[in-house]
Amino acid sequence: MKEDYIIFAVGECDYAIEVNKVERILPITEITPIPYMNKCIKGVINYQNHLLPIIDLRYIFNVTAYDEVMKKLFTQVQNDHSVWVESFKNSMSENRAFNLTTDHHACRLGKWLDSFSTHNENIAAILRELRPAHKQLHQMGQEILDIRDQDIHQAQEMTDDLVHTIYQSTSTQINKLIECSHTVSDQLQKLLICVENDIWFALQIDGAKDIIHVDKTEIKPMKQESGTNEFVQLQGVIETQENLVLIIESINVKELSSKNLPTVNMA
């Protein structure tokens, strides 16, 4: 007999859980931390006037926290543009070729900016400053390179303005993103509102991907030691056209309850 499963991402791996255990998928709203709880519990949210515990699957599966991933990305793009500016200055002072991109869509930051949108006003305010400054940085770089062929001295003067004004503005906004890495990560992740044994909870995931129909006979069992976790029991693995998907058999809600968490029975 076939069952419907929803596939979702946690880090580089895909997992699936039975659709009949999932109530809905929500963006992450304000999370209230709970002191002295197991670290796999991110906190609670108010869902239909009930408090639901949020289970951090990245922590459970020993995957780097998403806010740390975003902080690393923003630190990398800050370094990228520092290197870009230094290389540009050297190419001007030594009158040699500049080999890095002047296309603001092509760099690491540009690709991320093109793919990201937000309803968070604080992050949106940063992006309203960052997007035009970043675009101007690369475009002005190309303009200076074009001018250098006719007037090297004017190009060098423009380089000073590029560095002291436009780059500083870009760098300032990137630093703000680094400081807001946690907020950005919450904008990118989702919550699966789930129910098991009449107890409701939320799974924090990187994103939902697909619904698949699975015959139970297609699930390949896992070794007991690799499929066991204090909170999550893995049933096995299935192979899709894209990759392997780990099937979650159950969430250990009894263990959750034993930790004095605010689990909710809404039956």
Please identify what each model-predicted range represents.
Residues 41-44, 58, 193:
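Compact, glycine-rich, soluble single-domain proteins
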